[in-house]
């Protein structure tokens, strides 16, 4: 579970900060949950938790569930939020986010 990688309190705080529809901001979220300050190895482990089908990529369907990937209490992202997150993370334009793209996305300020 994600709580093996990040503090439960930080996850809870980060997810509740974006409880309102259309409020998701990935930069603030990764900062609040503590992931941004973690090592590349931890970021890669988080990626593999979020990559539910273990395809090596986080596809749009999985991105929509990113908050639920951190905690079951998380909400699904709206289509607009998901599209914006995909656009921010998909550097090579293949329509999905690979592990290196994810690490870059989390690390960007």
Curated annotation (Swiss-Prot):
Belongs to the parvalbumin family. The keyword tRNA-binding does not apply. InterPro entries: EF-hand-dom_pair, EF_Hand_1_Ca_BS, EF_hand_dom, Parvalbumin. Ca(2+) 2 binds at residues 90, 92, 94, 96, 101. It comes from the Eukaryota. Residues 38-73, 77-109 form the EF-hand domain. This is Parvalbumin alpha. GO terms for molecular function: calcium ion binding. This parvalbumin has an isoelectric point of 4.88. It comes from Pelophylax lessonae. SUPFAM superfamilies: EF-hand. In muscle, parvalbumin is thought to be involved in relaxation after contraction. It binds two calcium ions. GO terms for cellular component: cytoplasm. Keywords: Calcium, Metal-binding, Muscle protein, Repeat.
